[in-house]
Amino acid sequence: MGSNDLINEAYDDSEVVGEERESKSAWMKRWYQLLTSPLDLQLVINEKLEMINWDAYAKSLAKPLGNFLTILFFIIRLLQDNLIKPNYYKLNVKSGAFDLSKSNKLKEFDYLWEISSSFQNSNQFYAFQSWYFVTLRFLNNLFRFTIFILLSLNLYVSCKFMFGYFKTYNLFHLKKEFNSPNLTKHNLKDLSKEYYEDIYKQSLWSMLKHFFRGSRDDGPHVNQNEDEIFFQLRKWIPTNFMINLFVSFSPTAIVFLSFSDVSFTSAIAIVFHQYILDYIITKRFQRSVDDDLILSSAALQEYEDKHIMARINQCSNIDTLSSAMGTRSKTPRIFTTHSLCGEEIREVYNYEKREFEALPKMTESVPGSRETRIKDYGGISQVSDNQSHPIGFHYSPRMSPYYRDKVLDNNLAQSSSNENLEKGGAFLPNQDQNRPSKSLSPLRKTPLSARQKRFEGSEFNVLNKNDINSILRSPKKKKNYHKR
């Protein structure tokens, strides 16, 4: 063996020693933390338990565990009534109660000593020294301890199921009081910190009552305003895991087995009881609650589809109508509500006064003649019947002066174009001779033959048909009216 091998072995031994020291120091730190701060360990254990999804193990763990505990309690009670109870006297008789060998008076007489010794050997000595009765005595003590543990566990499960799963809801928008013992009225002052400071200043008994009962109830609240009152609902919501554990390890079966003489025929009653309780609570009542939840979800979805979504879609369709100035803002600034009589009220928010103001009622727009609609757009002057204007376009109040000037300019341009067309005597092929032109372009003011000659002699004759169509369909081209 060389020197290098010796060095490697020494190095390996040092690593093992270092790991052992680290493990010992880690165990020492853990024991020190356990002894000095047990609440931290309890907090860690509670966090680990809360992170487990117990409802996922309701069918696979809770129900088999409850049935196993019930069967175990039945077997123990069966052995107690049929094995321990017949030998109760032999197991509980004291060994020194009639021990005649300890009597000094009997020792003086030989014949009495012989009788006492024979009696001792035949009865008491055999009863207390036999392995059979020693085993029964051990089993009796074990059964008592196990029954005490099972009764305590069943009591904990029952109390946890009936009193340990409550959630409190504060209902601030509920106005109608329902006849429910879990619904109570409270004052809004109970939510403030001053209320808890007042409780801390009271006696120990008042603090204990608040701890077990919850927040106080100030009575019927007759003289208080509705805005100062809110309802508090204390709802019982047990978990699915605890429901299955309570049904399979029910206190009714435990009480029945505790106060009755258990035999093999009692197993039929226990099996029937377990099946009926599981069928009523798990397969009927709990599924009924799930069905009510489905109906509530369906009703809420129907209300959302028929009322909320329909109104949102209608408002979005109105907001996204195309106009000359682009789409409108999607932020609703006018709010529509209804009074108690069913009348529609339109309100707008005033940022200066910081309050809503009602808008004046507007009559429904009835489609009238073209001249009537033109008059409505800002007091435009009268026009003749042979003039055409865009129909079906609603101008905003902000742009009404702009479009009023455009309409007047359009009227003047159309009148001048009619005079030029009458003098020229040339019309487009697809143009009605009795109908004036709607365009303001200077090309429409000249005859068709002159325009064709001017175009052929210009530099634009090299453009093909596709280039002309792309120019005419350019997005920069503005339309001041809609075609019907």
From Swiss-Prot:
This is Nuclear rim protein 1. Keywords: Membrane, Nucleus, Phosphoprotein, Transmembrane, Transmembrane helix. The keyword Repressor does not apply. Member of a perinuclear network that controls recombination at multiple loci to maintain genome stability. Required for rDNA repeat stability. It is found in: Nucleus membrane. The keyword Transmembrane applies. It is a multi-pass membrane protein. One of its GO terms (cellular component) is nuclear membrane. The chain crosses the membrane at residues 145-165, 252-272. It comes from Saccharomyces cerevisiae (strain RM11-1a). Belongs to the NUR1 family. It comes from the Eukaryota. GO terms for biological process: maintenance of rDNA; regulation of exit from mitosis. InterPro entries: Nur1/Mug154 (IPR018819). Residues 416-457 are annotated as: Disordered. The modification Phosphoserine is found at residues 3, 417, 474. Interacts with CSM1. Residues 430-440 have a biased composition (Polar residues).
